[in-house]
Amino acid sequence: SDSAALFPEYVTRAVKQGMEYANLLPSIVATTTTIQSMDYRTITASPSEDDKELKPVVEGAQIPQTVVRTQDNLVKLHKRGRMLVSSYEALRFQKLDLFTVTLRQIGAYIARAQLKDAVDVLLNGDGNDNALTPTSLSSKPTYTDIVKLWGELAPYELNTMLASTVTMQDLLNIDEFKDATAGLNFQGTGKLVTPLGANLLHVPSLKDKTIIGLDKNCALEMVQAGDVITDYDKLIDRQLERATISTIAGFAKIFTGAAKAASYTA
């Protein structure tokens, strides 16, 4: 029917497709927690360097312990949404595919906004005294600086790097990043990798001249309150149909040491 274009299930499906297409979150989020409330307090563990070694335990001796506790502050959740308003004429005389493109684009906007929230938590913390202190570089990043970032992240693995457009341009001009194998991978898959094997992700919302390196397997938790929410109604006196799409999500750090940052001014 004419109103099928704004049918809630169709809207939800199209928006999710757009979110998945533009979604970099699976590349930086270790786990996703779905809740049915607006309040959520995550857990944390802060093992010392000695704890991470797991030294031998003699028979009958006490086994060392790692303490897991809840965080002091709640995870900050953000509601993101958009209303799509369409006239009866637009629905009646236009192809459904055009509305699908529009809805997918709304989904892409939501995914990018959530990525911005995630990067902000990585850099500035989630309110539990766990903001990053970027290492200051004297000039544009060099291969030595990237290796140093890799070393600072140990014992975690540097498998993901985040950079803005300007920073990406500086990184890709490093001689080691022009490696033929890396270039071939980019041409074949569209994915950038570093000489150290870490995936290099383009995050336009990240502050320029700042690099974030992380272990995606244990750095960040995504918390979402339910799924994509869609509501639909009609304004008969104006012959308009409306659909609202919204999501509620937030982010929290899991292991603070699993992410490091570097910045430069040159």
Regions found by a protein language model. Give the residues of each.
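Extended, solvent-exposed, turn-rich assembly/linker loops in the middle of proteins
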Residues: 124-192
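Short helix/loop capping segments that flank catalytic or ligand/cofactor-binding pockets
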Residues: 51-54, 66, 94-95, 170-172, ...
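Alpha-helical scaffold segments that mediate packing/assembly in large oligomeric complexes
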Residues: 80-153, 264-266
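Hydrophobic alpha-helical bundles in membrane proteins
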Residues: 68-72, 94-95, 125, 161
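Sequence/fold signature of self-assembling virion shell proteins
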Residues: 175-266
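Helix N-cap / beta->alpha transition motif
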Residues: 87, 163-167, 215, 255
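Glycine-rich, charged/polar anion/phosphate-binding loops
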Residues: 69-70, 145-149, 227-230
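Assembly/oligomerization interface modules of large self-assembling protein complexes
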Residues: 2-80
